[in-house]
Amino acid sequence: MPKILTFNEDARRALEHGVNALANAVKVTIGPRGRNVVIDKHYGAATITNDGVTIAREIELEDPYENLGAQLAKEVATKTNDVAGDGTTTATVLAQEMVRFGLKQVTAGAAPLTLKLGIEAAVEAVSAALLKQAIEVNSKETIAQVAAISAQDPQVGELIAEAIDKIGKDGVITVEESQTLGLDLELTEGMQFDKGYISPYFVTDAEAQEAVLEDAYVLLYPGKISALNEILPVLEQVVQERKPLLIIAEEVEGEALSTLVVNSIRKTFQVVAVKAPGFGDRRKALLQDIAVLTGGQVVASEVGLSLDAVTLADLGRARRVVVDKDNTTIVDGVGEASSIADRVRQLKQEIEVSDSDWDREKLQERLAKLAGGVAVIRVGAATEVELKERKHRLEDAVSATRAAIEEGIIAGGGSALTHVASVLDDGLGRTGDELAGVRIVRRALDAPLSWIARNAGLEGAVIVSKVKELEPGRGYNAATGEYTDLIAAGVIDPVKVTRSAVANAASIAALLITTEGLVVEKPAEPAPQDGHGHGHGHSHPQGPGF
């Protein structure tokens, strides 16, 4: 494809317009008085949401140069969501302000790479200051407050706190759709391990980028699978049962993988392949844990089993399996309770006799996975649109709660960023353009609080000025319209969420202000009206050529 190019100020301004377009759509949702955004879908009902990353993912601009800017801003939201699970709107607002102030400096003649050094130094100082302010999360009440703020629903906060109280801080929480109204919490036998799908073509839910298998068979194999004829017999048996299949193996590659991918794309049958967790003897032990949980067998020569001789009786079963790019969660395996209890007892004995701290730690991880179970929160609503929106908020709340447990909490409502900006007042000893870079971050840190106030119908600059006069920890509660001790009032944010928002916003802003040229594909010429001789072949599938 031929390319078109633009350079210098024109390139940077086009990127800024793209960033602004996306940020303007997202920032109206920030704060307790934030509004919703309605997203049209090519299929099904429209989505109504106030989740920043959900809105950002839907935005594509017509102008190719501006679209590059929008995609960079989208990266801020998605990266923050991946790392911390929340704070995507805050990150987007920060990025917009840093880009705005940064481009003003570049236009005035500042050296972009020197500005970048100042921005990076400022982010490091802010991150350290936020960690210093962190308050450890160790009570059920605090966990409930974190979740309630994220979901904007006290009932959700109580439910997530109850779930973590029952399964432990390292336990697994999944969110499922329910046919009934309201919220419901259920504890089930289950396990999660840190390996995701081998190929994204296995995804069944494109929006969540997950593969979800209901009432699935589970094949456990400690070796590599590359030849199709090795797994063909078991695939044929599973297809006849009309059930999905989860394959957990050291590796699935070559002819075997391509066949599974083709069948998944064509929806001949539902299958997901993931790499087995761990290495060496630990991998074998983890596979055996999964076998006990699902009531299956590890297909290994040591027990007289080979892949081409596997029957359905050798496979495990689970009510539900959820696989994303990083994790696999198995819920409600059909393994016998007595077998699971025996395995738990065995692990406890191994922990007692182990004389290696590393081995003991890994055994305790296995015990937590096997004995902790999975908390399933079922969410229902009157309409499909409301159901999707509530499920999004619940998933964000679970992620925010995990982030809070990991690094602690600080005062929310944007006030922590406004107060922590004071560490940059002296310019960190920088001079010239580096000092200008520090000041870019310093000015941008007020933006989240300003927009929380503006969405509540107030003048942002006035609220920011007033909050700066208050002690750290105190700020403006937009839900009640009062200046108060935010931590005591339960208006709190996870430190990890806030740090990620600042770091990711600064990263993209620094990239954008150091950009000097853009290269995009030239738009295709419109086809002639009679349709002869042109335009044929443009409807071929975009994936592999099947």
Curated annotation (Swiss-Prot):
Q: Which GO terms describe its molecular function?
A: ATP binding; ATP-dependent protein folding chaperone; isomerase activity; unfolded protein binding
Identify the SUPFAM superfamilies for this entry: GroEL apical domain-like, GroEL equatorial domain-like, GroEL-intermediate domain like
A cellular-component GO term for this protein: cytoplasm
- Stated EC number for the protein is 5.6.1.7
- Provide the protein's localization: Cytoplasm
Instruction: Enumerate the UniProt keywords alphabetically.
Output: ATP-binding, Chaperone, Cytoplasm, Isomerase, Nucleotide-binding
Give the chief site where it resides.
Answer: cytoplasm
Listed binding positions for ATP are: 29-32, 86-90, 413, 477-479, 493
For the keyword Nucleotide-binding, the answer is: yes
Catalytic reaction list: ATP + H2O + a folded polypeptide = ADP + phosphate + an unfolded polypeptide
**Annotated Pfam families:** Cpn60_TCP1 (PF00118)
Where does the source fall among the domains of life? Bacteria
Kindly give the Gene3D superfamilies that the UniProt entry links to this protein. Answer: GroEL (3.50.7.10), GroEL-like equatorial domain (1.10.560.10), TCP-1-like chaperonin intermediate domain (3.30.260.10)
BP GO annotations: protein refolding
Q: Does the keyword Cytoplasm apply?
A: yes
Location of the region described as Disordered in the Swiss-Prot/TrEMBL record: 523-546
Q: How does it assemble?
A: Forms a cylinder of 14 subunits composed of two heptameric rings stacked back-to-back. Interacts with the co-chaperonin GroES.
Role description: Together with its co-chaperonin GroES, plays an essential role in assisting protein folding. The GroEL-GroES system forms a nano-cage that allows encapsulation of the non-native substrate proteins and provides a physical environment optimized to promote and accelerate protein folding.
Instruction: Give the family per the record.
Output: Belongs to the chaperonin (HSP60) family.
Q: What is this protein called?
A: Chaperonin GroEL 1
Source organism of the structure:
Frankia casuarinae (strain DSM 45818 / CECT 9043 / HFP020203 / CcI3)
